[in-house]
Amino acid sequence: MNKSTEQTLWGLLENITENLKSKRLADVFRLVSFCPFETYGPHKHVRIEINYVKKGNCILHLDDESVTFREGEIMIITSGSNHLFEAGSEGTTLMQLEFLPEIFSHFHFKSEDGTVASTPVTLFSEENRVIKIVNNVCIMRVVQRIVNELEFKSRYYRYLVVMYYAELLVLIYRYMDESYLPICTNDSLKKAIAYIRLNYQSEITMQ
């Protein structure tokens, strides 16, 4: 990396951290445990909320559906979504990260074919009130690094956190492109979406 590139990178990171309206990189970053069947909510907030189920299981109740999360799974609750949290029969421990959407708004990506990828505004919209992520250690580790940096606040931590947020957004984009199915109770719809994604390059005949 030459000097001009290095200065550009540092300048970009500095610009992002200085231009956050809230001046906060996160509002909640912690491990929290809940007793069996303990509930929290219902409530909603502007913040994007990411919970990694470190132990046990839990249920997230939305206005018109409920979604179960087990150990090792991740829930992403989008801004403005009304939700109620309920711990499972053995309780649960979560790694929580909550931050304002404006952080993601500083990152814009292009897809590999050169077109503009989905923006954070469309990705974290009402259509995706809750995103369920399974079997993705990479996303969990990035969330863990963000929480650790915010907790210990070592030198230059703000720059690292901004870069980790960018990595987190890329990994979420990748997950949504490769394996995500919208959370819904209609099994036929899930199968149809899965079929289309597997055969999108082929001609599909609708009957």
PLM feature segments, named:
Residues S125-N135, L150-Y164, L169-Q207:
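Short, Lys/Arg-enriched, Trp-marked, Pro/Gly-tolerant hinge/linker segments that flank
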Residues K44-H61, I76:
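Short, conserved beta-strand element in jelly-roll/cupin
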Residues N2-L31, N82-L150, V170-L171:
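A hydrophobic/aromatic-rich effector-binding and dimerization subdomain
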Residues P36-F37, E71-G72, G80, L100-E102:
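Tight coil/turn sites that cap or link beta-strands
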Residues I59-H61, I77, H83-S89:
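Short beta-strand His + acidic residue motifs that chelate non-heme Fe in jelly-roll/DSBH
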Residues D64-T78:
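Short acidic-glycine-tyrosine-enriched beta hairpin
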Residues F29-H45:
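Conserved short histidine dyad/triad with adjacent acidic residue
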